[in-house]
């Protein structure tokens, strides 16, 4: 970490968090993980290794549904790992999917592939003894899980735009370049998981390894990046630490990016020093300076981000402490160029185009709605087998979207009928409401250790209840972006929803409303600590008013603000916790 100290960074006078010691002592992220892999007495990892595996894309979890039962039997919790693959832009080849499916069926507790809103897949329930075989499998098919968790740049998102195929390809290539450029240089991942090579001392490593961008202690906290192609904001570009908005020239070619920083949706119940936030614009950079801008933002966060209090360590808090102008100046110093003024752009929607769409290259793309985003086989819905059968015949690629759906991309005209027939045979094509189409949740129980309430498992039935409400008020064809997250950590991006539920306790949630369709506005707390049925009753009353009092084409989130049902969040660091402090301009 740099020894630079500037006004507003009082944290530098405080003790560092223990995570900083952990990273320093880790032998460039190797730790003693190899020793733990040989320990058959526990299904988990000990000491620092419990956290270090996160830098390799894994979390230790247990099945909370049976935790109490196992404790009564004097057994440790049923421990296993979550694996999150690194998949910039969400693109995966059919041959890779076939191998991923095989491992999930044979070696994971839940025999499922979970799609995430970070455009990748997760394995849940991987036993410790299968971790090295899993990583070696990924490596053999050109994949890995490096830096998909912990204090590094995580999986880079990119708009899944199947229509503008040329522009999407250009933006996707930059998403891949950004991901590769910001990866750790350490061979720790390969040494532990692929080669199985033990390194004894960090002294020798210092001679052969360096982290010129991330630094020896990496970043202060998680760091998320997205690339968006207007007018579609499917990646929720305002919700990330670093964001690139694609700008086209007069010929429709990608000419550069607007760069935004300081988005993020996590907060802590009752902790007014934490808040969700939409990103701020630094300005525009031409294509040739894209990687320099990414590196400059990362280095600024590396040097000035809070390493004392991890709850205030994301980029938005660094921007608040340095001021936006101060943050911009440091990024410009790092990249040795100035930002140009922000170029005009507009976002109009966030949802996926479910069903078939034709690209400008005449290829077809089929977007499949995956409810609860867990691809598994059930008697009435053998979705996992269905996707596997698609992978066996598909000649294009798959794209996991930031809305947790799956695109069968680049289907030739002559192959379209076969792809559709398979998808219909296995229940992958279905008639659903607009409300369900735009609903999303995090994983939550039973595997997430942070979960305070259900999310993934209650979302389908909750949406069914809201569908009844919309039908009752004759707005069944309308869309309201609805999201549930099991805790305030933000994984379900509920704070950018028109209706957002944040878990508070088992069976109880905080209800937030007032986000907008384009993902530009944070929602505000409306009712606290209430049940799902109470939430349905509240939404019933609000939808009744919306159906009769709204203006032409007025979205639900816009209506509740215009009608003064709820005050907008204007400057989250000032007014998220107290609507009486709303002021019209951002002061940071």
UniProtKB/Swiss-Prot annotation:
Pathway of action: Sulfur metabolism; hydrogen sulfide biosynthesis; hydrogen sulfide from sulfite (NADPH route): step 1/1
Signal peptide: none
One GO location term (cellular component): sulfite reductase complex (NADPH)
EC number: 1.8.1.2
Top-level EC class: oxidoreductase
GO biological process, one term: cysteine biosynthetic process
Function: Component of the sulfite reductase complex that catalyzes the 6-electron reduction of sulfite to sulfide. This is one of several activities required for the biosynthesis of L-cysteine from sulfate.
UniProt cross-references to NCBIfam families, sorted A to Z: CysI, PRK13504.1
Name of this protein: Sulfite reductase [NADPH] hemoprotein beta-component
